[in-house]
Amino acid sequence: MAKTSAVEKNKRREKLVKRHAVKRARLKAIVMDQGLPLEERFRATIRLAELPRNSAKVRIRNRCEVSGRPRGYYRKLKMSRIALRQLGSLGQIPGVVKSSW
């Protein structure tokens, strides 16, 4: 089980990303628009830098929904390889069967 503080920190980051997503996207569009004057683009860059660091999507770490483990994460199932193996062997994940050949 991962530290609860790390899991909670990641959840806080996810909330910040949702809260600032529209503003961040709008500022990024201004910065990337070559047709706008350089001063306006520079002001948008400064305002983008003033946003909280944790409001950037790249700061979010994919974590297992079951254990909070950050590594060995399967995006499709939102869980780690270890949790997948445990729940799969117990038959709690639909469509997952033990392989034999």
UniProtKB/Swiss-Prot annotation:
Cysteines paired by S-S bonds: none
A cellular component term, taken from the record's GO annotations: cytoplasm
PROSITE patterns: RIBOSOMAL_S14 (PS00527)
Molecular functions (GO terms): rRNA binding; structural constituent of ribosome
Single biological process term from Gene Ontology: translation
Keywords linked to the UniProt accession: Ribonucleoprotein, Ribosomal protein, RNA-binding, rRNA-binding
InterPro entries reported for this sequence: Ribosomal_uS14, Ribosomal_uS14_bac/plastid, Ribosomal_uS14_CS
Source species, domain of life: Bacteria
Xref: NCBIfam families: PRK08881.1 (NF006477)
Function noted in UniProt: Binds 16S rRNA, required for the assembly of 30S particles and may also be responsible for determining the conformation of the 16S rRNA at the A site.
Self-association and partners: Part of the 30S ribosomal subunit. Contacts proteins S3 and S10.
PANTHER family for the chain: 30S RIBOSOMAL PROTEIN S14, SMALL RIBOSOMAL SUBUNIT PROTEIN US14M
Homology family: Belongs to the universal ribosomal protein uS14 family.
This protein's name: Small ribosomal subunit protein uS14
